[in-house]
């Protein structure tokens, strides 16, 4: 029989004490739930008692969801990305975080998805940090009046429906009427102005987006632009969050005292995606089967476009940027069905924005491009931001064009017209012809000023209507070659006084005497 080893009680207690001291509790308070149903990108979980609305839910395999429906016994969430790896019975955990996307100058020149992941094959993005996609819009006290223009380079817009920095200007029209073309021209025209641009493509074909990216690259505009894509093949959840993600990326520049321009192309498809999600979540449908909060979907997005004052910029940058205001200008696009602007989503967005550019399918088909209907289009705040030359020379253009459209309709029935009416019709035809502009060919303020000057002062009255575009092109070439200093002076200050008027008059008369057009 082996001898029993005598155990010293003090040694045992010392050993236990050491073990207790060395023991560390590594536990995390995580709220877990179980997937009870999964279909159409919507997951229902049981047991997530402490989840918050809009919170990220983590699933196995690094898949995330967004909590949207909070019920007494279950939580409805929408899957962000691929849900094929998930199955009923798997666990979902609360993260305590809301959805964030990367922001910063490293995103410029890149194409990203709705979550900020690069999809252009140019490697990882060097972002300045992460920022939540949902933010409270700037308050009344932190805002500043709009008094600086965003030059789109399009005569019809800059003269008649001016857009200011911090404004929300809706572009509305049927499909294939040139809505995207206006937005892309506006982005191209920001080259060299310091305005950063964000283009959000929602529910578009990958080939269409690739074509837009290629055009931006060709015109040297991609380097100041972020392209956010939630394509037609992406889930409804990504199409729903893409505008908010793009807005956050644009806000980064606004909050640092810079100017940014964001295009949402288009919000109709975002509304469709949100309607799909809401119906799958069994939310009660309302008018046109949209959920009750469809207005809030767009208002909370578009209210984030603003011009904020220097004090707010200083506060947001912790005193790094002083004496500079920041702005985010929004150009939302809405697609109408057969020109019906009184449908639910178009009327919602019209009431939220500061004006609209209405594109007419009949004008487009008759060759007037951009096909802007001057009678239905309006800019509620842009007039305060217009340069002096555009305000002075473009003021009568919109009225003359609107009157021309009315007279044109009546003149079809009248057999003989008096001289005043005939002159007004001829002037309207010349203005219509002058407002035509090729895509991807934005003009400077001075070039637009020269064009408006010749129509305002009657220098086009003896030019045949079919020769106006060649007359204008020749005039611009002449001005660039012989009066470059005058053009430069107008571009620098945007001013218009008696001296500039006299110089323009002399230059145009010289050009007409050459007969080179």
UniProtKB/Swiss-Prot annotation:
GO MF, one annotated term = ADP binding
Q: What is its EC number?
A: 7.1.2.2
Subcellular location per UniProt equals: Cell inner membrane
Cysteine pairs bridged by disulfides in the record:
none
Question: Which superkingdom does the taxonomy of this entry point to?
Answer: Bacteria
User: Is Cell wall biogenesis/degradation one of the keywords UniProt gives this record?
Assistant: no
InterPro entries per record? ATP_synth_asu-like_sf, ATP_synth_asu_C, ATP_synth_asu_C_sf, ATP_synth_F1_a_nt-bd_dom, ATP_synth_F1_asu, ATPase_a/bsu_AS, ATPase_F1/V1/A1_a/bsu_N, ATPase_F1/V1/A1_a/bsu_N_sf
Its recorded reaction(s) are:
ATP + H2O + 4 H(+)(in) = ADP + phosphate + 5 H(+)(out)
Sites where the protein binds ATP? 173-180
What are the protein's UniProt keywords?
A: ATP synthesis, ATP-binding, Cell inner membrane, Cell membrane, CF(1), Hydrogen ion transport, Ion transport, Membrane, Nucleotide-binding, Translocase, Transport
Q: Does the keyword Hydrolase apply?
A: no
Pfam families attached to this UniProt entry: ATP-synt_ab, ATP-synt_ab_C, ATP-synt_ab_N
One cellular-component annotation, GO: proton-transporting ATP synthase complex
Q: Extract the PANTHER family matched here.
A: ATP SYNTHASE SUBUNIT ALPHA, MITOCHONDRIAL
Protein function? Produces ATP from ADP in the presence of a proton gradient across the membrane. The alpha chain is a regulatory subunit.
NCBIfam families under this entry?
A: atpA, PRK13343.1
Record protein name field: ATP synthase subunit alpha 2
Task: Name the species this protein comes from.
Answer: Legionella pneumophila (strain Corby)
